[in-house]
């Protein structure tokens, strides 16, 4: 929406960004950094020592990276779990970020226009307020997941939380006003109690003194959720400016990418390979991996499988897998520790993506017209999986325990059956809509222009 009656102020060219230290949050924040830099802003990124992102040569002129001290050992993430780690991180960083921001205000040659913080780094709001700087929330999840978090408190207050943790039948019930989401799809976590999750969500969706919210999504994907947030929940401007990976590329992988898989893909037929990657956090037990391997072998489809180091509990990588694992995967498969995902999804050989359905992976897959097998792990992934299957109709959700038969049937449905071909057609249509949205005159392009104008008038 255009802000009328305001004139842009000169010399407000610096923006401070505060990413959450996880791969799925760092990537879109750095894409936002590149996007705003292209619009004429100098960028200061304030990071924690935990999961520190080491900037490449892509981030040089007009980019500054500052690290704030915190005393969180690497082991805390595993020992505490993501939710308790989040609480501790926000508590640890509150004072150090305020001191850092105060120094930046004194040192910056360009006046700071605003502080943009990841919704999970909510400690940044108080410091921005104290330094008399406008602050803006950046949601790296879907608008629908953000909307779900925004009503969580109301559900909890009305004692509607029972279906979120009670019997299977109740969990299957549809959530009023959030069709087609079921209670079981709401973004809860297997890592913490419902009460702890409630506290996180109260903090992440509390706009406090925020001037606006920006979301890495597009109107063509989530128009109803965006309208709900804008008109009923937030009452401040909401800017859908994504998918950001289609606006500005930014190399941000915390793990080394094995690009040999591209050479392997070059030898495969069009739409003949299913790509399997469960993201940067999800874990799989050995028995689950064996069932997946067995199902893949039975499907007779070629596959590129990312098995992340440390993703198998009790094992560094696949060295502890039974001997039959290698026999099942070597014939038609290729396994890497980490892959250049955007390059993989854009490869003509890839016809499907088995994913945990993190929002970045979801956007990247839709952006390349690749349908998905959905195996959500936690949090907003379940929301995304439900939308992929029931709203956009380009996904097959695999629920419950994994066994060879379930895996084989899902892969064949996507890669062999007519159903999968229809999904590819719908995915291609969504891909074209997303590409149009980020081009001049498109909805995300216009929203980005309005957002840039907005922060120049603050």
From Swiss-Prot:
It catalyses: a flavonol + UDP-alpha-D-glucose = a flavonol 3-O-beta-D-glucoside + UDP + H(+); a 7-O-hydroxy-flavonol + UDP-alpha-D-glucose = a flavonol 7-O-beta-D-glucoside + UDP + H(+). One of its GO terms (molecular function) is flavonol 3-O-glucosyltransferase activity. It comes from the Eukaryota. An anthocyanidin binds at residues 25, 379. Pfam families: UDPGT. Possesses quercetin 3-O-glucosyltransferase and 7-O-glucosyltransferase activities in vitro. This is Flavonol 3-O-glucosyltransferase UGT76E12. The lineage of its organism: Eukaryota, Viridiplantae, Streptophyta, Embryophyta, Tracheophyta.
